[in-house]
UniProtKB/Swiss-Prot annotation:
Species for this entry: Eimeria acervulina (Coccidian parasite)
This protein's name: Merozoite surface protein CMZ-8
Lineage: Eukaryota, Sar, Alveolata, Apicomplexa, Conoidasida
Alphabetical keyword list: Merozoite, Repeat
Comp. bias intervals (Basic residues): 184-203
Superkingdom per UniProt: Eukaryota
Repeat (Sequence) residue spans along the chain: 5-11, 12-18, 19-25, 26-32, 33-39, 40-46, 47-53, 54-60, 61-67, 68-74, 75-81, 82-88, 89-95, 96-102, 103-109
Region entry 15 X 7 AA repeats of S-P-P-S-T-P-V, spans: 5-109
Length: 259
């Protein structure tokens, strides 16, 4: 048992050299503080560039003045709106498409359409026309519920739809018409009947009109009666055939169905 006692003593001295390396850790903490000082001076040059921002705000005010004069030419076309209030005599009889084609009328002058002065700008003309037509159609829809007219508001204007079908007689008797044209015209007829509740399908009414015109099945057919057709046409309504009358916002670009 005596030789085991001496090796217990050399274990204690190596515990002492552990304490001194703890001291050199403190000095490196001091040099961290000085670099915090140079951060403050660069904050000063930020303030001067804020001053030149104010002067460019002044030239914005003068261009606001020339905007007012173009609003004046809208007032003169308000006078020809009064006569269209009379045509409220649509017949209550059901619509029946004619068996004979009606020849398309000559296209109106591009400047004056619906009694609007040609000197007015395109924008003022379209705005005035859209406002007056909306009022007239609201009156017709309220006062003549049994006329067979159905109205559908669209982004391009107003569409007047009837229960009349496309006049397929013209296509079947036209030389050179193919079976594909006849099938397309039949499909277009079904589309026109659904257009009042599905006027967004496949490009809306404008897309339907363009497809129908490309196929050649849309001719200028009569609508309800010649009296109503002439009155509506006087308001800038374009009869595109297949039982569809289309009102454009820009009356200078009226659609007249031609083969």
């Amino acid at each position: 048992p005596l030789p085991f006692s001496p090796p217990s003593t050399p274990v204690s001295p190596p515990s002492t050299p552990v304490s001194p390396p703890s001291t050199p850790v403190s000095p490196p903490s001091t040099p961290v503080s000085p670099p915090s000082t140079p951060v403050s001076p660069p904050s000063t040059p930020v303030s001067p560039p804020s001053t030149p921002v104010s002067p460019p705000s002044t030239p914005v005010s003068p261009p606001s003045t020339p905007v007012s004069p173009p609003s004046t030419p809208v007032s003169p076309p308000s006078t020809p709106v009064s006569p269209p209030s009379t045509p409220v005599s649509p017949p209550s009889t059901p619509v029946s498409p004619p068996s004979t084609p009606v020849s398309p009328p000559s296209s109106p002058a591009p400047g004056a359409v619906g009694g609007v002065n040609s000197s007015l700008s395109q924008r003022s003309t379209s705005e005035h026309w859209h406002a007056s037509v909306s009022v007239q159609f609201e009156r017709w829809r309220d006062r003549t519920p049994a006329s067979g007219l159905r109205f559908a508001p669209l982004a391009e204007g107003w569409a007047i739809l009837t229960a009349a079908s496309c006049n397929l007689h013209n296509i079947r008797q036209r030389p050179g018409s193919s079976a594909a044209d006849r099938r397309h015209c039949t499909r277009s007829t079904r589309s026109s009947r659904r257009m009042s509740r599905r006027h967004r399908h496949k490009g809306g009414l404008r897309g339907f009109v363009s497809r129908c015109r490309r196929s050649g099945c849309c001719r200028f057919s009569s609508f309800a009666s010649p009296t109503i057709r002439s009155k509506l046409t006087g308001y800038g309504v374009a009869d595109v055939g297949c039982g569809v009358l289309f009102v454009l916002r820009h009356t200078a670009r009226r659609i007249l169905a031609r083969s």
